[in-house]
């Protein structure tokens, strides 16, 4: 299974909509930047028909160094999670 990169998306959209690669790159970069800025400011991002990017606070916990087995403290942190929407889940499920 191949991985789709940002460059692949830019090239696909540029070809499909007959836009310059630079214009398409600007649109994709600005779209992703808006998502980043929203998450940085503490807002969840909901993309209808696709899914939600949500912020979750994880508490500190004890962890283990896999090489040495020593117990180490894993500090509290905020993480971004992605929860696919129903439409996306249904379409992915159909491809099995």
Swiss-Prot record:
Source organism (scientific name): Haemophilus influenzae (strain PittEE)
Domain of life of the native organism: Bacteria
Gene3D superfamilies with a match to the protein in the record: IHF-like DNA-binding proteins
Pfam families found in the cross-reference section: Bac_DNA_binding
Keyword terms: DNA recombination, DNA-binding, Transcription, Transcription regulation, Translation regulation
Gene Ontology biological process terms from the UniProt entry: DNA recombination; positive regulation of metabolic process; regulation of DNA-templated transcription; regulation of translation
UniProt-listed InterPro entries: Hist_DNA-bd, Histone-like_DNA-bd_CS, IHF-like_DNA-bd_dom_sf, IHF_alpha
Gene Ontology CC: one annotated term: cytosol
Molecular-function GO terms, alphabetical: DNA binding; structural constituent of chromatin
Gene: ihfA
Subunit structure: Heterodimer of an alpha and a beta chain.
Job of this protein: This protein is one of the two subunits of integration host factor, a specific DNA-binding protein that functions in genetic recombination as well as in transcriptional and translational control.
Protein name: Integration host factor subunit alpha
Family listed: Belongs to the bacterial histone-like protein family.
């Amino acid at each position: 299974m191949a991985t789709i990169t940002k460059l692949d998306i830019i090239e696909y959209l540029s070809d499909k909509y007959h836009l310059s690669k630079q214009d398409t790159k600007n649109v994709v970069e600005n779209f992703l930047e808006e998502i980043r800025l929203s998450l940085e400011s503490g807002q969840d991002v909901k993309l209808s028909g696709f899914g939600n990017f949500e912020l979750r606070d994880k508490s500190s916990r004890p962890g283990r160094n896999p090489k040495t087995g020593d117990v180490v403290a894993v500090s509290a942190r905020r993480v971004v999670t992605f929860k696919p929407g129903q439409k996306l889940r249904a379409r992915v499920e159909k491809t099995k």
